[in-house]
Amino acid sequence: MTNIFLYGTLCDRELLEICLGRSLDNVKLLNAELENHSVFWVKNKNFPVIKFNRGSFAKGLAVLDIDDHELERLDFYEGGFNYELIKSDIMLKNNNFYPLNKKLQAYVYFNNDEKFEIGKDWDLNEWQRRYGLISRLAAKEYMLLKRRCREIDF
């Protein structure tokens, strides 16, 4: 089982369900932060990037205990955008069942493309209003591709 810290589009619960391939009813989702990082829009794009930023805290969600199949699905989705997992220490925040400020190791998707020009601070609500619907529809099609690739042993 693996812990993942999400900070961008996958904090949209509908998109996360599509990518995991199941309902979030039994998924442990907790508020969390990654210290010394901030999340920004990529300039002139519809997605975010996380960057080192001393003294800042990137807010997001910790997804606890996902299995290998779910991790493979997330990797497929994020890999299409040149993101890779790096293990980091995160801090759980303001959760009912876990102590406040509990440190935890989790994997974080970092983008490898240093050519991206950073835009303004990321805003999930803005993304949901402007791009959420079309992004979810595209994700459904893209995740179907994963199943088709597996069927032909690709």
Model regions and ranges:
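Glycine-aromatic micro-motifs
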Residues: 1-154
